[in-house]
Design a protein with these regions (language model features):
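A generic structural signal for beta-strand entry/edge sites
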Residues: 21, 33, 136-140, 203
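Active-site neighborhood for divalent-cation/phosphate handling
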Residues: 81-183
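Non-catalytic, solvent-exposed interaction/assembly segments
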Residues: 1-110, 152, 162-164
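Oxyanion-binding/catalytic loops of NTP- or PPi-dependent enzymes
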Residues: 39-44, 48-49, 133, 182-207
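Short beta-strand segments
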Residues: 16, 79-83, 144-145, 197-200, ...
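Short active-site oxyanion
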Residues: 12, 140-142, 194
């Protein structure tokens, strides 16, 4: 299985590839606070990214390379996110006694029950959640899948600029973690927040 979730890794750049631009962010941690060390953005040529899918990997790679020259960071590991119609996420239930490897094998065998694509076409990952509230001895498992091409094009674009994709996350979950981080830093109460709104150049998403 390919990693689609955020795994712990130090010194990563966050690179957001949208339909109209690329944004790069580098954070440093001081105590329990985070500080923006570098931030830069560049517009993308029309048609380089269409409906959140990279259509022209060379153009995207060139713009990321220009960002790399601009920010002059020594960090080469990067985190990117996938989203759109090529991403599938759902919660399934598996036997709680299974190890992660056994869960992986079972998901592969039963993949056609959860994913409407051939296994050859997708990258899959999963994350063990809480015990099932309905079925004793079962555990909820968050299953995520994305068209493999969508992942590989992002990896290729980063490599063209000299970066390595250490994390390929799902945009909605990356947004959730970013909100958690910001709410803790700004002393906000999550209970008072009813929605998160992402206002982009061509679309607005409400989480």
């Amino acid at each position: 299985l390919l990693s689609l979730f955020n795994k712990k890794s130090k010194n990563l750049l966050g690179i957001d590839i949208s339909s109209s631009s690329i944004k790069l962010l580098e954070l440093s941690k001081q105590g329990d606070k985070y500080r923006v060390e570098r931030y830069a953005t560049r517009p993308l040529p029309p048609g380089a990214v269409v409906e959140k899918n990279i259509a022209n990997v060379e153009a995207v790679g060139e713009e990321i390379e220009k960002l790399a020259t601009l920010v002059k960071t020594k960090t080469t590991g990067a985190a990117v996110a996938v989203s759109g119609s090529s991403v599938i996420a759902k919660t399934i239930e598996l036997n709680a006694s299974l190890t992660d490897l056994e869960m992986e094998n079972q998901i592969i065998v039963e993949a056609d029950q959860y994913i409407p694509y051939s296994l050859d076409e997708v990258a899959i990952d999963f994350e063990r959640q809480l015990p099932s509230r309905k079925n004793e001895g079962m555990v909820e498992v968050l299953l995520a899948a994305c068209k493999r091409e969508n992942v590989e094009l992002r990896v290729d674009a980063l490599q063209m600029a000299g970066y390595e994709a250490m994390v390929v996350d799902i945009e909605a979950y990356a947004m959730e973690r970013a909100f958690k981080l910001l709410s803790e830093q700004m002393d906000l109460s999550p209970e008072g927040i009813v929605a998160i709104m992402d206002i982009g150049a061509t679309m607005t998403t409400i989480y």
